[in-house]
Amino acid sequence: DLIERTQEFLASHPINRGRHAPANMIWPQSPGRRPAMQPFSEKYGGVKGAIISAVDVIFGLGVSAGMDVIKVPGATGFVDTNYEGKADAAVAALADHDFVYLHMEAADECSHMGDLKLKLQAIEDIDSRVIARVRAQLEGAEVTYALLPDHPVPINLRKHTRTPIPVAISGRHIPVDACKIYSETAAQDGGLGFLAGDLFMKRVLDIL
């Protein structure tokens, strides 16, 4: 009923009378209230955080947590995104932030499409155009890296699952474990063991 009423209202709205392509309907989606989240810096002992993404829900979480939100021109959330721009923005943000969350959406979207070839391209692009670029610019710096997906999206299911995700953490003071590759199977024998979400952040920040 609300959607139909907005169509009626917008049809006679003065702004739309002068538009070639009028807005003729409003579709509210997932209404809710802002979550009462403890500020990131307060929860983690004064750590100043920034967030980079092309996804609005990720930005919303960052805003709710009191993190600085950084928007990168050309960031699309797909395989045509500005990989280099996001990598450079992350490096620049480290100049005045203790923690930077760089979110990449392309592989997730390819999984929902069920496109294996495109997903492999997305993963390879993230590896060569983001991770390698960030590491090259920060070579010699005292930086801790954490690599992980936010959730699994098996390409045969094309939807999110609750399967544990593989995590890799790298830094000067982190001991090397037996894992030689990054995968769900290999991670089961890794030195981190199984970490719940809140424990993961604590572990990463304990290393900083």
What is each PLM-predicted segment?
Residues 1-208:
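Feature captures the catalytic ectodomains and active-site-proximal regions of enzymes
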